[in-house]
């Protein structure tokens, strides 16, 4: 994989774009530690190491942090991670971790949402909101 571009996201993190279409966010110290530079080749073993030692764990920590304040659907969590430049492999790993430990359950979320909002919103509004959150009509 070739590092196409490194763009700062904030003071501490940068977006690393690989092969012009695949992006991931790393802290500047991690970029230095793995000697990642624009135009250079990123060896597969280095990528695997970054994925396994950093990104998979960070994705799980991020979704747990997001769930701390309020329940979310699988789709909402996937979108948040994607917006945070987590690769698909890390997103899938984090979602599977949550499902395995029963931190997320879209069916249960939908049931609680309907129960809570049934007196305040119409049936159609509730259906629309649940579809927007990634849940089916049922």
Model segments located where?
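An alpha-helical, amphipathic repeat domain used for nucleic-acid recognition
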Residues: 1-138
């Amino acid at each position: 994989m070739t590092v196409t571009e490194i763009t700062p996201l904030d003071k501490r993190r940068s977006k690393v774009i690989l092969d012009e279409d695949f992006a991931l966010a790393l802290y500047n110290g991690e970029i230095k530690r793995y000697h990642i530079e624009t135009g250079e080749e990123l060896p597969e073993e280095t990528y695997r190491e970054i994925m396994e030692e950093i990104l998979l764990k960070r994705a799980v920590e991020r979704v747990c942090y997001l769930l701390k304040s309020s329940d979310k659907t699988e789709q909402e969590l996937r979108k948040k991670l994607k917006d945070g430049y987590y690769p698909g492999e890390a997103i899938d790993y984090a979602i599977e971790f949550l499902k395995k430990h029963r931190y997320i359950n879209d069916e249960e979320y939908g049931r609680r949402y309907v129960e809570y909002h049934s007196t305040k919103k119409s049936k159609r509004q509730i259906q629309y909101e649940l579809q927007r959150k990634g849940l089916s009509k049922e």
